C-alpha cells in the first residue's frame, strides 16, 4: 500500500459503501451491455499476504479481518439493492496457515475461519450476510512440503470448516519459486515431474482438505 498504513486496506473509511456500489454497478453494467452474468464475485484478493505492499507487483490488497468484513457487507448491500443474484466468495487467503492461525502477520489478519464464521466475532462475523457463500476460499501455496505437513494442515482445514458447517474451495495454484523439489517456477516446465507435483497438490486439497472446487 502507498497509504502509509502497511497491512491495512487501501480504502478510505468513508469509501466502503462507494466500493460496494462500484462493484454492483460494474456487474450490472456488464450483464446489461455484454450479456455476461457473474455467478460469483471475490472483492479482495489475498488480504493476508506477507509480501512487500509498497510496490505495484502484487495483484492483491492487504486488509485486516475487520476491514474485509466491512467490504463484504457493503458489497452484499449493493448486490441486494441492485437485485443481482451474484454471490460473494471470501476470502482468497494467500496461505492456509492464515486460515487457522497467524503467519507473518498479527491476529488482525489471521484465524480467518473462526473470525468470519464465529457468531461471537461481532465485528467480523459474516455467516448471516446476504448472498455470501457459506464457504471459504484459499490458495494452495507455501504449505506443500514436506509431504506429511502437506497432509496435516489440510486435515486441520477440513476439521475447522466442518466445525463451522462451511465448505472449502481451493481457488488458485501455480508453481512458485520456493518449490525447490521441482526447481522453482521459472522458466516454463512441461515435464511429467512438474505435472505429477501439481497433481499431488490438487490430490491433497481434494482428499484431505475436502476442497469442493
Language-model segments: residues:
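Catalytic-core region of carbohydrate-active enzymes that cleave or remodel glycosidic bonds
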Residues: 137-213
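Receiver (REC) domain switch/active-site residues of two-component response regulators
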Residues: 39, 134, 212
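Generic secretory/membrane-interface signal
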Residues: 130-133, 166
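Substrate-binding cleft and catalytic face of glycoside hydrolase catalytic domains
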Residues: 1-131
Amino acid at each position: 500500500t502507498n497509504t502509509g498504513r502497511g497491512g491495512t486496506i487501501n480504502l478510505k473509511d468513508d469509501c466502503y459503501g462507494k466500493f460496494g456500489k462500484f462493484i454492483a454497478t460494474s456487474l450490472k453494467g456488464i450483464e446489461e451491455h455484454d450479456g455476461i452474468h457473474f455467478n460469483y464475485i471475490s472483492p479482495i484478493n489475498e488480504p493476508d499476504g506477507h509480501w512487500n505492499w509498497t510496490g505495484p507487483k502484487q495483484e492483491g490488497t492487504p486488509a485486516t479481518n475487520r476491514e474485509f468484513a466491512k467490504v463484504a457487507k457493503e458489497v452484499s448491500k449493493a448486490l441486494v439493492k441492485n437485485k443481482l443474484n451474484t454471490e460473494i466468495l471470501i476470502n482468497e487467503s494467500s496461505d492456509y496457515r492464515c486460515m487457522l492461525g497467524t503467519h507473518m502477520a498479527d491476529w488482525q489478519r489471521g484465524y480467518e475461519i473462526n473470525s468470519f464464521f464465529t457468531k461471537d466475532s461481532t465485528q467480523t462475523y459474516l455467516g448471516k450476510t446476504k448472498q455470501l457463500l457459506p464457504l471459504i476460499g484459499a490458495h494452495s501455496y507455501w504449505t506443500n512440503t514436506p509431504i506429511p505437513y502437506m497432509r496435516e494442515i489440510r486435515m486441520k482445514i477440513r476439521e475447522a470448516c466442518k466445525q463451522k458447517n462451511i465448505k472449502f474451495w481451493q481457488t488458485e495454484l501455480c508453481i512458485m519459486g520456493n518449490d525447490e523439489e521441482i526447481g522453482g517456477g521459472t522458466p516454463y516446465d512441461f515435464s511429467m515431474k512438474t505435472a505429477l507435483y501439481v497433481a499431488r497438490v490438487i490430490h491433497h486439497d481434494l482428499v484431505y482438505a475436502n476442497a469442493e472446487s
